[in-house]
Every structure is written in C-alpha cells, then in structure tokens.
Amino acid sequence: TAIRETFTSEKPISVRISATDWAENGITEEDVLYISSVFKSVGVDIINVSTGNTVSNEAPKTGRMWQVPFSDTIKNTAQIPTITAGIITDIDQINTIILNGKADLVALGKPLLLDPYFVRKAQAYENFEVKDIPKSYERGIAPLYSLQQTERKQLEKMKRKLKPKSNKN
C-alpha cells in the first residue's frame, strides 16, 4: 500500500479514530469495525481509540476507564492492537486493561499533569529495583521504592480483608 511504501515496516503506523460520536444515529460499532479492518489491511499497526469531539450534539457517558470498552471491541473483533485512554489514573487500572487484553497500550494525560512522578511511583509499586532507574534519580527515589513496596503490601492485605466472603473461594 502507499502507506507502507512511504513508511517501511520498521516505522510503526498509528491512527487515531473516534469510536463513537455519542450522537443519536451517529457512528455505529459496525462503522468502527469496518474502518478498523480497512486500516489494518493497508498496513496500520495500531489504532489509538478515542471517542467524541466530532459533533456539537454529543452526549458522552464518561467515567473511570470509560473508553476501554471501545478499545476492547476493536482489538478483539478487528484483531488489531489498540491504544486506550479515558480517566485511567493508577497502575492497577493499567494492569487490568493490559492483562485482560482490552488494549495493548494505555495513554496517560491528566495523571501525568497531576503527578509528574506517576511512572516512577508505578515502578516502585510494581517492585522494580533501584538499579532499574537512572543513576541521577537514585538518591532521591530509592527511599520511595521501599516506601511504595510497604504501602502496596499494606493495601493488598487490606483488600484481602475487605473482600466479600462470596469472592474468597
């Protein structure tokens, strides 16, 4: 295809689509799956799934991880990797999305504006070793790693205690 003639396979191609316009009689799931399949057939490697901001009469339904279901549908029906976003605010949400195969990448915006150390804290939470961080950060971040690991253990213990008996089996 013309796309791959310009960008060889060493250069990944991503396109961003709006999976819904949130408008009555607007973009349908069928429309989205069709365009996703077309993009895949012409050499697109990954689709950045967004929603809305295309018509003035939209009525979006937002909330935590609100765009993930659209990414999931495209990824698992059109069989093309996806990027998702939409009020994803912590590492547990990211892990849930990736490990459950709902997207291949998670785009973060607002969490990084609120906390520029979000990624470093996530590394600590996930038990990365101090040797995994750049030398220039070591003295400032090393104590954070042990603190985050302790907090994670406490949080996991609390989650287990609060889990309903019906879910413990």
Q: How does the language model describe each region?
A:
Residues T1-N169:
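Flavin-dependent oxidoreductase catalytic cores
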